[in-house]
């Protein structure tokens, strides 16, 4: 009887810790390059238009699309080097006449609103997710001006 209570208690405790450990893995490690620097390096390669960047599984996943196809680049957050790439399905087409994504991201970083964990074009605007002090914040920005929507 005691063993059943202990097993249930341990199982409940492990279940409660799961979201915390998953959340902790979604933030670039200390000493990482700023996302704006990562994006600027990808932009300089002229592979296409960057449609999103997300920190996941220890890498920045940067999606780049040209007229023919899209690919995801997996970039080490500390060194900024590309570790691998793969073809992927196209998403929404980015609006024309937008600011470079690295420029918009750099302006957000300069405001000190938190650590950017994701940035993507969605429904004609730029969606940015940040983390600071255990809180998650989402911004919607005009991709042409970088101003909040």
Please place each PLM-identified region on the residue numbering.
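Bacterial N-terminal signal peptides that target proteins for export
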Residues: 2-10
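Cleavable N-terminal signal peptides
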Residues: 11-12, 22
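Short, non-transmembrane alpha-helical segments in secretory-pathway proteins
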Residues: 26-50, 93-115
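Extracytoplasmic
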Residues: 33, 45-48, 57-59, 68-70, ...
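Hydrophobic/anchoring residues in structured secondary elements
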Residues: 52-55, 87, 118-121
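Conserved histidines in hydrophobic membrane contexts and catalytic metal-binding motifs
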Residues: 60-63, 75, 80, 122, ...
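Mid-chain, structured segments of secreted extracytoplasmic proteins
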Residues: 65-110
